[in-house]
Amino acid sequence: MFVDQVKIYVKGGDGGNGMVAFRREKYVPKGGPAGGDGGKGGDVVFKVDEGLSTLMDFRYQRHFKAARGEHGMSKNQHGRNAEDMVVKVPPGTVVIDDDTKQVIADLTEHGQEAVIAKGGRGGRGNTRFATPANPAPQLSENGEPGKERYIVLELKVLADVGLVGFPSVGKSTLLSVVSSAKPKIADYHFTTLNPNLGMVETEDGRSFVMADLPGLIEGAHEGVGLGHQFLRHIERTRVIVHVIDMSGLEGRDPYEDYVTINKELEQYNLRLTERPQIIVANKMDMPDAEENLKAFKEKLTDDYPVFPISAVTRQGLRDLLFEIADRLETTPEFPLYDEEDMAENRVMYKLEDEEAPFEISRDPDGTFVLSGAKLERLFKMTDFSRDESVKRFARQLRGMGVDDALRARGAKDGDTIRLLEFEFEFID
């Protein structure tokens, strides 16, 4: 089964917790703190595997969580970093953040990797908090939570050439006679529901990958007839081969078909019009085909080459394949996404987090609710079982201006403050 879109959940591993420990050794009085740091959590890494061709595996496993780092130990022993979770994806996979709809990674080459969810750093042990004023600190940090997000995976097939056109114009038949691909062929519309790839080789030894894409209909750019699902596979092709049925057996006007399909391509993605297009007048072995082709050329205003062929009798295929190979030699690849934009979307903590470290809202019951990525991160890294850790967290809140902001919002002694699932009293 061909699967080309799926939504999954990924989470980097949490960092290991830091340790509160002290050196206890004979003849060494007041040995001092000796708690080690926690290890880093594992990253969730996507890696391209050219042996895969579909996202089928993700239908059965939709949650990916990397291992957490090992906790710190006594004698200043640091916890081991967790191994990364490597998830294999097929070439042509686009990773999109489900919340922001921004592209995180475009994975096209075998072995290419991208960190999708970064693991948290390990918490610091009490050795890190020793100062002249507090040489034996009773506090440590919990590990930093790993990044978590819902993402959408889209598979856009990797092909040099894309066959486009209305249903039943002969795209699958054409692919089957110029390559060893065996697409399903029948005399009804939408026989092809999934892209079929075939390797084509010309007589002079040049080769390229051709994709038979499912038939399009009017309104495809708006999703009509599974249009979005089909159109996404055209985006990576360098040359578009527009197959048109010249027989007129279904009562359609070949030129109207041509105009309709090109309009759908343009409205789906304007950049598709930048690609070279070759018009294939198919089914020239049928009785009215020559007359229809003549009328088509009279109406055609675009400067695209027209190749009359018959996929069934193989008439005209040699010249067509040579033209496609020639066009590919002079046509560069069309990158779908900007590399810098994708790199920015993979960053864990952006500048915006520093500009707005917290927000304050108020529930109907009068409770003040604190939120914000930085604030929640500090909260999760605090060990509330130790008084010194709690006091440190209170100092951090004051340093961030939380106390002053609460007073400005009208908070008074005894008011309830909520942060995530934790509630505490405001003391002025």
Swiss-Prot record:
Domain of life where this protein originates: Bacteria
GO molecular function terms noted in the UniProt entry: GTP binding; GTPase activity; magnesium ion binding
Region feature (Disordered): 118-143
Metal-binding recorded as keyword: yes
Subcellular location: Cytoplasm
Complex formation: Monomer.
UniProt similarity note: Belongs to the TRAFAC class OBG-HflX-like GTPase superfamily. OBG GTPase family.
Entry protein name: GTPase Obg
Species, as recorded: Bacillus licheniformis (strain ATCC 14580 / DSM 13 / JCM 2505 / CCUG 7422 / NBRC 12200 / NCIMB 9375 / NCTC 10341 / NRRL NRS-1264 / Gibson 46)
